[in-house]
Each structure stands twice: as structure tokens, then as C-alpha cells.
Amino acid sequence: MNNNTTAPTYTLRGLQLIGWRDMQHALDYLFADGQLKQGTLVAINAEKMLTIEDNAEVRELINAAEFKYADGISVVRSVRKKYPQAQVSRVAGADLWEELMARAGKEGTQVFLVGGKPEVLAQTEAKLRNQWNVNIVGSQDGYFKPEQRQALFERIHASGAQIVTVAMGAPKQEIFMRDCRLVHPDALYMGVGGTYDVFTGHVKRAPKIWQTLGLEWLYRLLSQPSRIKRQLRLLRYLRWHYTGNL
């Protein structure tokens, strides 16, 4: 078996993470032996680690997800500190989603998109079809009522979707994916937050050099000073990291 089809796991504060070496490893793992894995993908960064710590419901939700991976550079550094031999790298959720969509287009994998504003969702669909010929079997923007959820789950099931990506923000998207899987279990689910906005150019992502240096958080802070309260909250995570309380 190709070594890329398996991956070690690492534990941070009780949360088990998949250790992917790079993007290619992630893709080979998810498409092991030509068979797309089923389950839920959840990106983990320092902010989400704090939420998990403080919110028992969110912790239960995320613990139940099969594929938790290091999306934030702080989490990667913590894994490397706790496990010095770990060959783990950051796999950004936005990049992983694009690579999954490109692979889906190549292989004809059926995709259902959920979330986002109606116009952003429409632009996302059009770009996915034009760029990678993605087989989109259905979509639903994020503006639906709670009483419409069950009908949406049934629609997703009837579509036969093999990949369902949900852009609703945490923890709403994790709750949605958990509940939808009760109706349509045989698919790979991925929570993607604001990825559709980035993909369609409505939100600018940090330049590559900032990403490479692990400073995407600083770029976002400089672009959106209102994030300062969220960033200050991360000092608690840094304390865990530097005191070895991982």
C-alpha cells in the first residue's frame, strides 16, 4: 500500500488530529486506492481549539468528526513541539477545498454545495464548472429556515452527492453536517467557512509570502483591525504552547 494512503494521528489537549505531511499526502489519503473516504473533515486552528475547550457541545461535535486536520500554523507548531519527530505541515482548508474540487472535476465526483450568499454561491458554481468541470448535483445558499433543514437533507440524499461542502461558519456548519449525515451518511463532508467568498474574489486572502511565513493571522488583523479582540483571546493558546500544556 502506498504510504500516502495512511497518516499518523497526534493528540493536542485531548483532540486527535491527522498528521498530513503536505497537500499531496492529504489528497492521497482522502482518495486512498481510488476510493473517496466518507466522513467529516474539520479544519483545526488555535481559535477553534479554544472554542472546543470552552464549549462542551462543540467539543462533542468536533470529536465525532473523522478527519480533523491542522489548518492553523499555531496548531502545527504545537504538534511539532509535543511530537518532535512529527512530519506534519499546515494544510489550509481553503486550499484543500480547491484541490478536492479539482480532483472531483477530473474524476466526475458528484458535489453538493451548501451555504454562502445567493450571488456568491452562484458565482462559486459557475467558476467550479468553468475551471474544473465540477459535477455539481445541487446547491443551497445559507438563507434557509430551520424548518427547511430536513427537506434539504432529503434533497442532498436524493442527489447522490459524494462530496458535500458547507460554508456556514463554525459551529453551525458542524451541526449541519452531523445532522445531514443521519440522512445521507455515504459522503465526504467538509466545513469550509468563508471559502466561497475567497474563491470568488469577494474576500482577499493573505499573499503567499505571508502564508508561507505563518503570518496569515497578522495580515487579517491588519486588514480588519476589528479582529483584535479575537486575536487577544489567542494569548491563552500561546500560554498552553509555551508552557507545554498540550
Curated annotation (Swiss-Prot):
Query: Could you tell me the EC number(s) of this protein?
Result: 2.4.1.180
Which superkingdom? Bacteria
> Per its UniProt record, what NCBIfam families does this chain match?
PRK03692.1, wecG_tagA_cpsF
Recorded hits in HAMAP family, A to Z, give: WecG_RffM (MF_01001)
Q: Name one Pfam family in it.
A: Glyco_tran_WecG
- According to its UniProt entry, this protein's organism is Escherichia coli O1:K1 / APEC
> What's the protein name?
UDP-N-acetyl-D-mannosaminuronic acid transferase
Cysteine pairings via disulfide bonds: none
Q: Which InterPro entries match?
A: UDP-ManNAcA_Trfase_WecG (IPR023085), WecG_TagA_CpsF (IPR004629)
Q: Does the keyword Iron apply?
A: no
Please give the pathway this protein is involved in. Bacterial outer membrane biogenesis; enterobacterial common antigen biosynthesis
Sum up the protein's function in the record's words.
Answer: Catalyzes the synthesis of Und-PP-GlcNAc-ManNAcA (Lipid II), the second lipid-linked intermediate involved in enterobacterial common antigen (ECA) synthesis.
